[in-house]
Amino acid sequence: YSSATYTMDSLAQGYRGISTYNSVLNGNLKEFVDVCYPELYYMDQNRYAFWPNAEDNFLAAFTGVRYLLSKSGDLDSSKYELMQQFGGIYLYRNVQEAATARFYVNTISEDSLKELCNEENRETLLENSLALEDGREIEDLSDLEEISDAQKKSSVVLNAPEKDSCITGTVSARADGYVLCMIPYENGWTVSVDGEEVETEKGDLGFLAFPVKEGEHQLTITFHAPGLKAGVGASIVCWIIYFGMLGYGRRRKRKAAVS
């Protein structure tokens, strides 16, 4: 899996890979890494990578990684099940259930997550509750509520997107709660539940979250680049001014030539 990081095999083979993503760091996602998985940092704190920690299959499942490509044929079978071999490449399946979105009834505050999270208990915290700005304050792991049957039996399914700016899906919620999507939280995302827009929140410090009521729901998650409409409008105005100045200059030249 480390070789794929450098060769970007996902681009060559036509699938959506997560090994390499080159951009300015998302500040919210960086905060999640700082608090929950600082070992993801690679070389310095301006970049982080999954592959050095790929054997942590809880992290893989939490972020929606179902399969792993590796040149090693002897990965820990309690974490990754060998599915098939293609020449020198081995395909493994994560034995933990991986999802790109999940449902929570339990919540804790962001401050509680920051205060309590460490390498020993982060899996318990992330699996049990969703951290929200106005979530429930706790002082110790013993203050966590038990995972209810409603939380266990609820489900979220996100469909493979037909275009990058729009994702659809469904929620089967056995109680009022929240959906957490493995989408970095940032301005520009809007969420509609059954056609009605709902307020988005920052979940687990770095991801997109939103509330849903008990029942069966249809989801639409859409991204609009912040400032795009204003930028397009300003560009149109500038072009109008530019062409107007060109036309004015040409008319002046014609008048000067005639006189």
What are these regions (language model features)?
Residues 1-151, 166, 180, 258:
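Conserved luminal/periplasmic juxtamembrane motif of membrane-embedded glycan-processing enzymes
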